[in-house]
A protein has these predicted regions:
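SDR active-site lid
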Residues: 159-231
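The beta1-alpha1 cofactor-binding region of Rossmann-like NAD(H)/NADP(H)-dependent oxidoreductases
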Residues: 23-24, 44-55, 87
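Residue(s) in the substrate-gating loop at a strand-loop-helix junction
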Residues: 126
Length: 261
């Protein structure tokens, strides 16, 4: 998704700062884009580390003088029963998915405010940011927190009369590698092993057939132009959002029926 957003920025004539945990692929991509005439700065960054994101902001403002669009997009995923995932697994996901967004806000927003000019911040949540499901505890918690954080930021910027706008991106299946982001975080002896395998197969199939990142990016930029807070990529999930809200207002108990455990 991040690469799709970067390519869309470049297609619209912008200068881009790229961040990724892996230095070698990041530099290769930057060289490829620069070779095609793009203005690109690449900064290896672990978004879980506040000092890394602060250095990323320094590089962006030093290199280009200003930042008008900020995309807090890094994300990872693990599955398994909530009580089976280790504290380290919980911390790993929350540090990247949630705290990475917090670090982005803290490092970039004060300087963007000081510019006193229009700008936009897009935080990537997920379908899971609005709909919980079994076996996705750490991921769902992190993504629902990103929704709450982005709403809070929206209200705060509104309260001070800022020209900065915010959006939260809640994508459905997008053709990315997120299903494999948890390699190396295997579940130990687990009562959820079969259900976990079923879920991951379901996710991988959906992601493989998912929306192209370029199409996702096009929707994001349309929302930026229209100053829309909520960005959805798959309208077919809206009935599920509505059903959840209706159940909540009726005081009903949640029911999950996408697949059986």
């Amino acid at each position: 998704i991040g690469l799709g957003l970067a390519r869309q920025c470049l297609a619209e004539g912008m200068k881009v700062v790229l961040a990724d945990l892996r230095p070698a692929p990041l530099q290769e991509l930057a060289a490829e884009l620069a070779g095609a005439g793009a203005s690109v700065i690449a900064v290896p960054t672990d978004v879980a580390r506040a000092e890394d994101v602060a250095a990323l902001a320094d590089a962006a403002f030093t290199g280009y003088g200003r930042v008008d669009l900020l995309f807090n997009n890094a994300g990872v995923l693990l599955s398994g029963f909530s009580w089976e995932r280790s504290i380290a697994d919980w911390q790993w996901i929350l540090n990247i998915n949630l705290m990475g967004t917090v670090h982005g806000i803290r490092s970039f927003v004060p300087r963007m405010l000081a510019q006193n000019s229009p700008g936009h911040i897009v935080n990537t949540s997920s379908l899971a940011g609005l709909l919980a499901s079994p076996l996705m505890g750490p991921y769902t918690v992190s993504k629902q927190a990103v929704v709450a954080l982005t709403e809070t930021l929206h209200y705060e910027l509104q309260a001070i009369g800022s020209l900065l706008k915010t959006s939260v991106l809640c994508p459905g299946p997008i053709a990315t590698g997120i299903a494999d982001s948890g390699a190396g975080h295997s579940l130990r002896a687990s009562v959820s092993a079969d259900a976990n395998e079923q879920l991951m197969g379901f996710l991988r199939a959906g992601i493989a057939a998912g929306m192209a990142p370029a199409d996702c990016a096009a929707r994001v930029f349309q929302a930026i132009r229209e100053e829309q807070f909520w960005i959805f990529t798959h309208d077919e999930f809206k009935p599920a959002y509505r059903a959840r809200c209706e159940t909540l207002l009726a005081g009903g108990n949640p029911v999950y029926d996408a697949f059986s455990i």
